[in-house]
């Protein structure tokens, strides 16, 4: 099968995408597929460079990768691709929309407000949420332009920074607890990972630098494990996920809260999904092969 590895892109996460793409190429080549690296520098590249491939493995992140755009283009070209469809991708990229759906479905998530300019910052609403808060681009990833703000004085500057990366900014209550991630493959949860960043939170450096954080497989207490699994599965169903996603949570006082869903989890050597799969004996090559297999089974 002729598989195009689509990577690069136009978002702030381009370098992460290129790293993911290189790793995917290295391991998919072991499975005797014909691999074609497709580096995207502008949106129009997909229409031209994807011609002739049998399957597109998406190693993109952020804008044009995780927001449903490239998925729609590939469907128009009748090229099957990895991961979730356009609607789920677009919704999960929009943190505000995701949290509204989670709240409607009675799935725990931290309180938040969104703003689109410095002028419409509602300081009273933020006070009700309670400091400290995370200020971050509504549609960003990899913790780019994300800041932990401990009082009112720091809000304006953090919002201004986040607005450089997105037209909308989320201000979310900082729920202090243990951060965990649940990797979902074809609707089933792989072993849970605990994320223990060496910085104050799981920022860009902690995510992608060697030694930036410790990510370890953990055995949750039975009742908590059941709650976490039920919540991850509820997210999968409510947001109509397909093939694979990563559900990030915080556990505080034995109660899990969903942070966000990642529809195209990173595939670098430091990435969480391969670590979780490896804990049940699924090698990186086998994981990639499963993603291709399950993606081909989805009716688009």
UniProtKB/Swiss-Prot annotation:
Q: Which PANTHER family has this protein been placed in?
A: D-ALANINE--D-ALANINE LIGASE (PTHR23132), D-ALANINE--D-ALANINE LIGASE B (PTHR23132:SF23)
Its UniProt pathway annotation is:
Cell wall biogenesis; peptidoglycan biosynthesis
According to the record, the segments passing through the membrane are: none
Write out the GO MF terms. Answer: ATP binding; D-alanine-D-alanine ligase activity; metal ion binding
- Spell out the protein name for this chain: D-alanine--D-alanine ligase
Co-factor: note: Binds 2 magnesium or manganese ions per subunit.
Instruction: Name the source organism.
Output: Clostridium botulinum (strain Langeland / NCTC 10281 / Type F)
Q: What is its EC number?
A: 6.3.2.4
Question: Which top EC class applies here?
Answer: ligase
**What gene does the UniProt entry assign to this protein?**
ddl
Q: Subcellular location, in the record's words?
A: Cytoplasm
């Amino acid at each position: 099968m002729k598989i195009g590895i689509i990577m690069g892109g136009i978002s702030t996460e381009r370098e992460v995408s290129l790293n993911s793409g290189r790793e995917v190429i290295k391991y998919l080549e072991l499975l005797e597929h014909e691999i074609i690296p497709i580096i995207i520098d502008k949106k129009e590249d997909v229409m031209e460079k994807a011609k002739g491939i049998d399957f597109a493995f998406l190693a993109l992140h952020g804008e044009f990768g995780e927001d449903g755009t490239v998925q729609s283009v590939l469907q128009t070209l009748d090229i099957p691709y990895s991961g979730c469809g356009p609607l789920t991708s677009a919704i999960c990229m929009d943190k505000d929309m995701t949290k509204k759906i989670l709240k409607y479905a009675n799935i725990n998530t931290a309180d938040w407000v969104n703003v689109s300019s410095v002028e419409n910052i509602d300081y009273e609403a933020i006070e009700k949420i309670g400091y400290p808060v995370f200020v971050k681009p509504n549609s960003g990833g990899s913790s780019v332009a994300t800041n932990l703000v401990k009082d009112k004085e720091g809000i304006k500057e953090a919002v201004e920074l986040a607005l450089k990366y997105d037209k909308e900014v989320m201000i979310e209550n900082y729920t202090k607890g243990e951060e965990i991630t649940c990797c979902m493959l074809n609707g089933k949860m792989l072993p849970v990972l605990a994320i223990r960043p060496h910085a104050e939170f799981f920022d860009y450096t902690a995510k992608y630098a060697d030694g930036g954080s410790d990510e370890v497989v953990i055995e949750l207490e039975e009742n908590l494990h059941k709650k976490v699994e039920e919540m991850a599965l509820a997210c999968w169903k409510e947001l109509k996920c397909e093939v694979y996603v990563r559900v990030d949570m915080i556990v505080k006082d034995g109660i899990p809260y969903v942070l966000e869903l990642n529809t195209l989890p990173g595939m670098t050597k430091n990435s969480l999904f391969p670590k979780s799969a490896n804990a049940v004996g699924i090698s990186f090559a086998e994981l990639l092969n499963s993603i291709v297999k399950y993606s081909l089974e989805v009716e688009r």
